[in-house]
C-alpha cells in the first residue's frame, strides 16, 4: 500500500484553527483580569473622591460649629440697652452701714455733712447774710427792708422797769458784768424775773430797752 495523501480540505481546516489565529485560554484570562482591574481601579478612584469630599464637608461643618461655639461661649455676655446708674452718691462705708429699710434722707443726714441750699432760709432768719444791720437799741440783726419800722418801734418802746432789791443769798453770775451776785448786793429784778446788779442794768438801759437775756420781750 502506498502513503496516504492529505486532502486539501483537511489542510485548510487545520490552518484556519492553528497558530495564533485561535484565541488561547491564557489570553482570555488575561483580558478578563485586566477588565476586572480597570473596574476596581475606577471604583477605588470614585470611592477616594467620595471619601475626600465627605472629609472636607466634615471639616467645614466642624469649623462652623467651633466658630458658633466661640461666639456664644461662656465668655460672651449679652449686652442690655438699659444702663443702671451707679449709686455713686454714697461711699462704700455709707452703703455698708445703711440698712435696706433706711430711707435716702436719713442716710444723707447720717453722714454729718450739712447741705446749704440758697434760698432755703427766710431772709429774717439770717439778715446779716443779706445786707442787714444790728439795731443799736436792742442789738438785733434786722434786714434793710425792716430797718425804719424797727427803729421807730425800738425808740418809742417804753423802757423796762425793774424792782430794786437786796439779795438775800448768793445767786450766781451777773449776765452783764459776769461777776458773782453775792448776798447783800443791790440788784434789779426785771418783769421776766431776771436779776442783775443795779449799776449794771442802769448802764445797759442807757443803750438798750430790753432784757439782756430776752431781747424779744
Swiss-Prot record:
- Which pathway or pathways does this protein act in? Protein modification; protein ubiquitination
Q: Known catalysed reaction(s)?
A: S-ubiquitinyl-[E2 ubiquitin-conjugating enzyme]-L-cysteine + [acceptor protein]-L-lysine = [E2 ubiquitin-conjugating enzyme]-L-cysteine + N(6)-ubiquitinyl-[acceptor protein]-L-lysine
Query: Topologically, how does it sit relative to the membrane?
Result: Peripheral membrane protein
Q: By its UniProt entry, which Pfam families does this protein fall under?
A: zf-RING_2
Q: Where is the composition biased (Polar residues)?
A: 68-100
According to the record, the residues making up region (Disordered) are 1-27, 63-111
Q: What is its EC number?
A: 2.3.2.27
Keyword vocabulary terms for this entry: Cell membrane, Cell projection, Endosome, Lipoprotein, Lysosome, Membrane, Metal-binding, Myristate, Synapse, Transferase, Ubl conjugation pathway, Zinc, Zinc-finger
Write down the species.
Answer: Danio rerio (Zebrafish)
The name under which this protein is listed is E3 ubiquitin-protein ligase znrf2
Q: Where in the cell is it found?
A: Endosome membrane; Lysosome membrane; Presynaptic cell membrane
Gene Ontology MF annotations: ubiquitin protein ligase activity; zinc ion binding
Amino acid at each position: 500500500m502506498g502513503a496516504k495523501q492529505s486532502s486539501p480540505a483537511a489542510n485548510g481546516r487545520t490552518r484556519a484553527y492553528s497558530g495564533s489565529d485561535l484565541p488561547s485560554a491564557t489570553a482570555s484570562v488575561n483580558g478578563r483580569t485586566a477588565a476586572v482591574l480597570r473596574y476596581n481601579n475606577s471604583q477605588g478612584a470614585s470611592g477616594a473622591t467620595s471619601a475626600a469630599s465627605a472629609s472636607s464637608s466634615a471639616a467645614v461643618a466642624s469649623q462652623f460649629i467651633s466658630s458658633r461655639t466661640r461666639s456664644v461661649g461662656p465668655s460672651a455676655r449679652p449686652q442690655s440697652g438699659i444702663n443702671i446708674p451707679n449709686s455713686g452718691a454714697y461711699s462704700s462705708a455709707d452703703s455698708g452701714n445703711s440698712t435696706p429699710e433706711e430711707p435716702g434722707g436719713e442716710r444723707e443726714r447720717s453722714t454729718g455733712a450739712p447741705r446749704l441750699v440758697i434760698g432755703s432760709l427766710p431772709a429774717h432768719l439770717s439778715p446779716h447774710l443779706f445786707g442787714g444791720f444790728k439795731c443799736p437799741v436792742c442789738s438785733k440783726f434786722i434786714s434793710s427792708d425792716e430797718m425804719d419800722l424797727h427803729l421807730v418801734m425800738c425808740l418809742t418802746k417804753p423802757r423796762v422797769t425793774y424792782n430794786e432789791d437786796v439779795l438775800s443769798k448768793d445767786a450766781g453770775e451777773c449776765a452783764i458784768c459776769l461777776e458773782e451776785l453775792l448776798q447783800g448786793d443791790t440788784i434789779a429784778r426785771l418783769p421776766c424775773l431776771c436779776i442783775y446788779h443795779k449799776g449794771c442794768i442802769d448802764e445797759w438801759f442807757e443803750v438798750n430797752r430790753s432784757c439782756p437775756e430776752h431781747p424779744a420781750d
